[in-house]
C-alpha cells in the first residue's frame, strides 16, 4: 500500500486507532458510514472498520526524522537551537488548499510541509490524544 494513500482514524466501537484505506458507504439503514479498510490476507478480502469521521487523518507520504509516517493532525516537535535546549517548537500538520502544511503553535502562519520538517521534527502525538502539547508555551 502506498503510504500517501493511507488513512487512520479511531474505531467507533473501542476508540483504537486503525490504519488503511478510507471509504464511505451506506449501512443497511441507508445511513452514511465512514470506514477504514484493512487487507485481510488470510481470506483475500478487506475488513471494513467503522470509524469516527471527526478523527480521520490522511497520511502525507512523508516521514519524520525518525522514519515515522507523518499524518494530518499530527503534532511534531523540534529543538532547533542547541544553545537553547529549552526552546522547543511544536507544529501541527494541517491541510491547506493544495497541500499539507505545518502550523506553529501560537501563530496563524502556515508553511508547506517539506524536507526541513522531515529532517528536524519528530511526531510526538496528535490533536486527538495529545491536545495539551499545543498548549505548551501559549
Predicted segments with their positions:
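Secondary-structure transition motif
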Residues: 1-138
